[in-house]
């Protein structure tokens, strides 16, 4: 992503707003309603670090938005893959309570926001 941001800047010389960056995965909910999605944290952490490095290189980044705050219905995968920081109890056949459960990535990203990206570790 760092290289892509630098190339866009070099070619177009305009500020960049990253509007959608994230990871769809097969999240599993534990019997105690926990979702340990370290893979999402690692993915986003690496991408945010690359964005920070690009900014250091002179790229003007206006903002960064993740793919989705909550799990969503994908036109391709239904509810099989999960995308958000909050798990929604729902599946393709509309079976589920629609209850929401905060994933580990929710708490991590909350800390990222509170520190303005200065704390990416998990």
Task: Write out the residue ranges for each language-model feature.
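Non-catalytic scaffold segments within catalytic domains of secreted glycoside hydrolases
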Residues: 1-122
């Amino acid at each position: 992503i760092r290289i892509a941001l630098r190339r866009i800047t070099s070619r177009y010389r305009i500020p960049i707003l990253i509007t959608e960056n994230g990871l769809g995965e097969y999240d599993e909910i534990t019997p105690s309603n926990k979702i340990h999605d370290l893979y999402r944290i690692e993915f986003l952490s690496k991408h945010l670090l690359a964005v920070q490095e690009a900014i250091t290189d002179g790229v003007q980044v206006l903002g960064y938005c993740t793919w989705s705050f909550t799990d969503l219905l994908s036109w391709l995968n239904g509810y099989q893959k999960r995308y958000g920081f909050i798990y929604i109890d729902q599946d393709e056949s509309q079976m589920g309570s629609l209850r929401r459960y905060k994933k580990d990535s929710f708490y991590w990203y909350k800390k990222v926001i509170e520190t303005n990206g200065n704390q990416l570790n998990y």
